[in-house]
UniProtKB/Swiss-Prot annotation:
This is Ubiquinone biosynthesis O-methyltransferase. One of its GO terms (molecular function) is polyprenyldihydroxybenzoate methyltransferase activity. PANTHER family: METHYLTRANSFERASE, UBIQUINONE BIOSYNTHESIS O-METHYLTRANSFERASE, MITOCHONDRIAL. Pathway: Cofactor biosynthesis; ubiquinone biosynthesis. Transmembrane segments: none annotated. The gene is ubiG. NCBIfam families: UbiG. Pfam families: Methyltransf_23. S-adenosyl-L-methionine binds at residues 45, 76, 97, 141. O-methyltransferase that catalyzes the 2 O-methylation steps in the ubiquinone biosynthetic pathway. It comes from the Bacteria. Its EC number is 2.1.1.222, 2.1.1.64. One of its GO terms (biological process) is methylation. Keywords: Methyltransferase, S-adenosyl-L-methionine, Transferase, Ubiquinone biosynthesis.
Length: 252
């Protein structure tokens, strides 16, 4: 959930958010712990990534590892909740995060699962400066609302995307509905996530994301809304983009 940190370039990093997620790093793989909402959300976002990537790369969804031969960068990987299923789908996964504690948790769990994932504590800026990539797929899921400079962060992520590739961005919309439900409701009423997890002022409107990338050689698609059904306890795609939404970015 947070991006990476080190002595390397890290101007988009918010140290307070890094510390907040580091403090609960051991709970990433506990489906009933502090990251329980992400475990519930994961099937919806995984299905979206898989569907869009199959179409983008013209791959056979019935194959055991349909994305074999493709590279993927998971920025702000947290404990690896997305990195692991992406590796199982055949991607060669590089995963970075701001918190060394998150990376240690993720690497330990991947080793227990017999998965080869390139985890490292590093920033997107650091990877770009090193000349890493570019990657066929870049994930920045529920990350951009936690960084200090979202515009610079998103442009850096786009530069790490290979021509012909696709980037996924998931975040929260800065609406009164999101303030009431995703901030006050989720943190202080339902206690789904620890208080202080989000700052409503850092939520982003879809048009702001488009503006961030206006000068880049990319195209942005979406928003694609996602909504939670309290009766079923599941997330699904929705026409409602007032709270949670995803965008895709393609480079041709």
């Amino acid at each position: 959930m947070t991006q990476a940190a080190s002595a390397a370039p890290s101007w988009s990093i918010d140290p307070a958010d890094v510390a907040r997620f580091s403090a609960i790093a051991a709970e990433w793989w506990d489906p009933k712990g502090k990251f329980a909402p992400l475990h519930v959300f994961n099937p919806c976002r995984l299905a979206f990534i898989r569907e869009q990537a199959l179409a983008r790369f013209d791959r056979d969804g019935a194959a055991r590892a349909p994305f074999e031969g493709l590279t993927l960068l998971d920025i702000g990987c947290g404990g690896g909740l997305l990195s692991e299923p992406m590796a199982r789908l055949g991607f060669a996964v590089t995963a970075i995060d701001a918190s060394e504690k998150n990376i240690k948790t993720a690497a330990t769990h991947a080793a227990e699962q017999g998965l080869d994932i390139g985890y490292r504590p590093a920033t997107a800026e650091q990877l770009l400066a090193e000349g890493a990539g570019p990657f066929d797929v870049v994930l920045t899921m529920e990350v951009i609302e936690h960084v200090a400079d979202p515009g610079e962060f998103l442009r850096t992520c786009a530069k790490l995307l290979k021509p012909g590739g696709i980037m996924f961005v998931a975040t929260l919309n800065r609406t009164l509905k999101a303030l009431a439900l995703a901030k006050i409701g989720a943190e202080y009423v339902l206690r789904w996530v620890p208080p202080g997890t989000h700052d409503w002022k850092q939520f982003l409107k879809p048009e702001e994301l488009r503006a961030f990338l206006a000068g880049e050689p990319v195209a942005m698609q979406g928003p694609f809304g996602v909504a939670y059904n309290p009766l079923t306890g599941r997330w699904s795609r929705s026409s409602d983009t007032d709270i949670n939404y995803m965008m895709t970015v393609t480079k041709d």
